[in-house]
């Protein structure tokens, strides 16, 4: 059941209904599509929607109703999206429908903080935005107020190995702070014991 839940949610995040999914004669994929279809029919009969369905229905509504889309394009002349690194394909499509024509779009995001890929977030949306929108200005917020220099230096060194990022160099006016130490826990209980001991 959990695997099917992720499958259905993932397909909706991509803007795909069961009839849009190509199975390529893969029996597993065909089974998943049938379950997706049955799930959607059951939801429709019961008058229920999941979160991904809310997003997809709004997207389809705008795609299939140019008059309504124009109304919202005129109503929302400026669009701001925060935590942009956590957007999925349908949410990116929303942004394109609402804001691309006017070009008055501002996104705020950190491509080094994308942690919701398992939930459909596509870090590629940041790169897409910078290539698909005209006159994009990137403002890097690199000064950090929370961490010490030692932590930031280690983080910068580690994340620099990721070649699929826009790039930035975090810095702080704070002092170097404690040196970083590494503890390898045997399991989650050992990890919890170590952390609680350090906190005391």
Where are these regions (language model features)?
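Short linear capping/connector segments at secondary-structure termini
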Residues: 19-24, 75-78, 111-112, 171-179
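Conserved helicase NTPase motor core
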Residues: 8, 25-128, 140-147
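Conserved P-loop NTPase-based nucleic-acid remodeling module centered on helicase motor cores
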Residues: 1-12, 19-23, 34, 183, ...
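Proline-centered turn/helix-capping motifs that create local helix->coil transitions or kinks
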Residues: 12-18, 103, 158-168
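Alpha-helical scaffold elements adjacent to nucleotide-binding pockets in ATP/GTP-utilizing enzyme cores
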Residues: 3, 7, 94-97, 125-132, ...
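Helicase P-loop NTPase motor core
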Residues: 134-138, 142-200
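Residue-level signal for pocket-adjacent positions within structured domains
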Residues: 11, 16, 44, 110-113, ...
């Amino acid at each position: 059941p959990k695997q099917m839940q992720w499958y259905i949610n993932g397909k909706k995040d991509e803007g795909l209904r069961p009839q849009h999914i190509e199975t390529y004669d893969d029996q597993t994929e065909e089974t998943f599509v049938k379950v997706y279809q049955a799930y959607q029919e059951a939801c429709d009969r019961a008058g229920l929607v999941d979160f991904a369905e809310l997003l997809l229905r709004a997207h389809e509504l705008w795609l299939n109703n140019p008059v309504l889309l124009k109304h919202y394009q005129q109503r929302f002349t400026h669009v701001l999206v925060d935590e942009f690194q956590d957007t999925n394909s349908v949410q990116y499509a929303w942004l394109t429908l609402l804001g691309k024509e006017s070009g008055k779009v501002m996104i705020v995001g950190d491509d080094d903080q994308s942690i919701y890929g398992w939930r459909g977030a596509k870090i590629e949306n940041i790169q897409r935005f910078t290539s698909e929108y005209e006159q994009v200005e990137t403002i890097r917020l690199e000064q950090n107020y929370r961490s010490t220099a030692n932590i930031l230096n280690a983080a910068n060194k580690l994340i620099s190995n990721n070649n699929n990022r826009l790039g930035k160099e975090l810095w702080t006016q704070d002092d170097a702070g404690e040196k970083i130490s590494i503890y390898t826990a045997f399991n989650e209980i050992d990890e919890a014991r170590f952390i609680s001991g350090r906190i005391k």
